[in-house]
Amino acid sequence: MANADTPHYDRDFLLSPAKRNQIVELWEVEKFGRDSFGDPGAVSLYGMTPGQWHARGVRILARTTLEAVRDPLGNRIGEDVARIAARAPPGSVFGVVDPFAGSCNGLFWILRHLPGAEGLGFEFEQAIFDMSSRNIESLGASIKLVHGDYGKLLGQHRFPGAHHIVAFLAPPWADALSAKAGLDLGRTKPPIENIVDEFERIYSNNPILYVTEVHERLVPEPLAALRTRFEWSELNVYDIPGPTGRHGVLLGAMRWNASGALTGR
């Protein structure tokens, strides 16, 4: 439990080498919420408060407390995806792919808004893969989580050609986010355009909706370059506070527009 010597639970502390891969206790999750948001219930995951998901057996690492897509953001992302998915031809089948699955909460919320869709996640880091595998199993979530580098495995676990693909792209930002310039989408790890290249190589004939998590402040040039890659795009920033500012998504579609349902940038 917290005492007078307990450090401030913020981004720097949770990502520190000594703390980042430790399993955090419930009081620590609530302290991070209180210290960073003024709300001990801020780290809501899988549709539950911290107390609820902890009681269900869900456990997370210190870094996941900060890095996970929290429920309010996940819900808004899922709503936007469902809005675009509704414009696909009747009877369309959807596969949702998250190459940087982490907690799988972003994937969880997109699937929640796309009933019947299949979910596939990739996670490179063993500690996070092990933790998230146990969590989604305890929740009975319809997500297939694969351990390894998505770049090497994407083609081995591809959805059929008839599927509409939703690609949720939320790679580590690392130093791509700066207080001065905002988020540089060309400096994420890996750059967003490189990830798009991989998906276009594997899913060259599938309709794809790219859903890229973004910050409220974006370096203009990489954003503009990325948007030129898509046949249609839309930028949405949500009024939901985060540890470093508001987050949102850049939606970008390829081959989704056969019916002319998506127009403009």
Question: PLM ranges: what are they?
Answer:
Residues 98:
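Class I SAM-dependent methyltransferase core
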Residues 103-116:
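Conserved SAM-binding loop of SAM-dependent methyltransferases across substrates and taxa
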Residues 118-123:
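Conserved SAM-binding motif I beta-strand of class I
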